[in-house]
Amino acid sequence: MYSSGVDSREKLVEAMAELMWERGYSATSPRAVRELSGVGQGSMYHYFPTKRDLGLAALDHNCRVQLDSWKAALKGLEDPLEILSAYLTLPRDPLKGCRVGRMAQDKAVVADDGLREPVAEAFARLREMLVVVIGAARSQGCLPAGLEPDHLARTMVAVVQGGYVLAMAEQDRAPY
């Protein structure tokens, strides 16, 4: 799965991140991570004494990857409405879910503040980006003056995350 130039720690983080995205944190076993990464048990426990330690690194990785993809997709656009539209219509794999949002559905992640906080922080940063754009659209008269940017940003994120939930529940890409 990985090139020889990737170190063992990075292989473990990337494998755990991928498996967490596919299966969730709770359903991802250290053995599955070792098998996917090709890294031995001794090396895994050298870098990550516990599954939680590896999970934290993988959550940080997934949150960073997701935030970077949101930023990259919106980069270069200047019209606020075009930016908002681009966010809503980003290419997604609805049957796989959001790298970040899937973690908010995992009971073990939600029950552990250390695991939950990177997820909450990623959504907060996304909302902050959207609030700036919504504020610009409102200032330019493209959106009603009475519209609350934070409320609309939260609604937009909820709509996208809800689309993932519907797609997975129905095993249908139609919500996108």
Question: Would you name each region that the model predicts?
Answer:
Residues 83, 94-114:
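Amphipathic alpha-helical segments used for helix-helix packing
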Residues 8, 51, 58, 62-66, ...:
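Hydrophobic/aromatic residues within well-ordered alpha-helical segments
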Residues 57, 68-97, 149-156:
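Hydrophobic alpha-helical connector segments
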Residues 82, 117-122, 139-155, 174-175:
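All-alpha amphipathic helical-bundle segments outside canonical DNA-binding/catalytic cores
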Residues 64-68, 97, 113-139, 151:
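Amphipathic alpha-helical packing segments from all-alpha helical-bundle domains
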Residues 102, 147-166:
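Hydrophobic alpha-helical segments that form the core
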Residues 5, 11, 15-53, 57:
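Helix-turn-helix
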